[in-house]
A protein has these predicted regions:
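N-terminal signal peptide c-region/cleavage motif recognized by signal peptidases
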Residues: 23-27
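Cleavable N-terminal signal peptides
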Residues: 19-20, 30
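N-terminal secretory signal peptides that target proteins for export/translocation
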Residues: 1-10
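Low-complexity, Gly/Ser/Thr/Pro-rich intrinsically disordered linker/tail segments
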Residues: 208-211
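N-terminal cationic amphipathic segment used for targeting or macromolecule association
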Residues: 2, 28-30
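Sec-dependent signal peptide recognition
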Residues: 12-18
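Cell wall/extracellular polymer interaction/catalysis modules
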Residues: 30-184, 191-205
Length: 211
């Protein structure tokens, strides 16, 4: 009797396996379809690589204690001559900002090729951040960041890696020098846009820096 019951359970398990596989495939397909739909809705074709966008979405979804449905993507794989910062409203599915951003002095000239989590490296850091509080410092209105990627950006606070505005991060500097100026590792924004962007993303939104 026990053997017969065991055989029945074993057979049921095999019958359920295809259903489980179908469910997993459907879930994966649905996620990919949603990613592609949002990518099109935001008008990111030709501006941001699909795979980079998907990685940013995955990172956004894994961050705990988000307090704002805002995702900022920094694509350091692009040169500083291109607008490589994207601020996305994940609730309204809207691209709020698409603008320039500087990288660290020791990360490279035109493009960022070297990244570090070390103090005094003056390099940009990759990975996932959660935005924190604002303050007034030597660069004016600025935004502190907490690095959530161990070994990649976990020293962001100690390194004073913050979002701030800079005159060297705007199109005028770009036209004059054919590249943006560089920071000491901070994602520096065009001065005229910095306050508005900081106010949009401050207080618990997610930043994904790709390179």
């Amino acid at each position: 009797m026990r053997q017969a019951r065991g055989n029945i359970d074993w057979q049921r398990g095999w019958l359920l396996l295809p259903l489980l596989l179908i469910s997993l495939i459907w879930s994966s397909t649905a996620d990919a379809s949603w990613d592609q739909s949002l990518y099109r809705q935001l008008g990111l074709a030709g501006k941001l690589d699909k795979q980079t966008f998907r990685q940013a979405l995955n990172s956004y979804q894994t961050v705990r204690h988000k307090r704002k449905p805002i995702l900022t993507i920094i694509d350091y794989s692009k040169p500083s001559t291109q607008r490589r910062l994207f601020v996305i409203d994940m609730k309204r599915h809207k691209l709020l900002y698409h603008t320039w951003v500087s990288h660290g002095r020791n990360s490279g000239e035109l493009a960022a090729k070297h990244f570090s989590n070390q103090l005094n490296s003056r390099q940009s850091s990759l990975g996932v951040y959660r935005t924190a509080e604002t303050y007034l410092g030597k660069h004016g209105y600025s935004l502190r960041l907490d690095g959530l990627s161990p070994g990649k950006n976990s020293n962001a606070r100690k390194r004073a890696i913050v979002v701030h505005g800079a005159a060297y991060a705007n199109p005028t500097h770009l036209r004059k020098y054919d590249k943006l100026g560089r920071s000491w590792g901070c994602p520096a924004l065009p001065k005229e846009q910095a306050r508005a962007i900081i106010d949009t993303i401050k207080g618990g939104s997610v930043i994904y820096a790709h390179g």
